[in-house]
Amino acid sequence: MRIIRTKAGGKQPSAFKNCVAEDKEKELNYCFDRKEVKDHGEGGLFVGKQLVDGEKVIIIEDVMTSGKALREILPKLEAAANVNVVGMIISVDRQEKALNSDLSAVSEAKKEFGIDVYSVVTMNDIIAAIEDGVVDGKEHLPAMYNYRATYGAK
């Protein structure tokens, strides 16, 4: 199985890889994409183990807003190898409308690409945690409610 991160920033994918591999006692490889193809050094569009035809891939992303990052990475994956994207894991689902749709970006990913997206936390979870006093931030709730009313999926 291959883990693809769509951004090089933040925690390195190896931390996630090691956590999953220890739990399942399997070797997992990972790579991440570059903004543009590099023609020197390691070269190529992906850094890390190169993609192989028939390989299963999980995409890791920090946040899903409109689904734009997923739409950008899929053609890159298709150009690199004939892989099978079996899912996507995101830290935060902002529960925002997808591009040109009233569906959430997560629902649109399933409908359009057949990809299940799993989130660690949703915008509703964050709002509920603030409302319940689990985390600070009550002063931000009016802006969050307004944001959700304006951009939130139906």
Region spans (language model):
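Short glycine-rich phosphate-binding loop at a beta-alpha junction
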Residues: 1-7
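PRPP-dependent phosphoribosyltransferase catalytic core
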Residues: 75-154
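Short, well-ordered, mixed-charge alpha-helical segments that flank or form enzyme active sites
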Residues: 38-42, 66-68, 96-98, 127-128
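A contiguous pocket-lining binding segment that forms or flanks enzyme active sites
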Residues: 46-93
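Residue-level recognition of the N-termini of beta-strands and the immediately preceding loop/turn
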Residues: 1, 27-29, 84-87
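Fold-independent oxyanion-binding glycine-rich loops
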Residues: 33-36, 62, 92, 120
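Short, glycine/charge-rich flexible loops or terminal/linker lids adjacent to PRPP-binding catalytic cores
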Residues: 14-57, 68-72
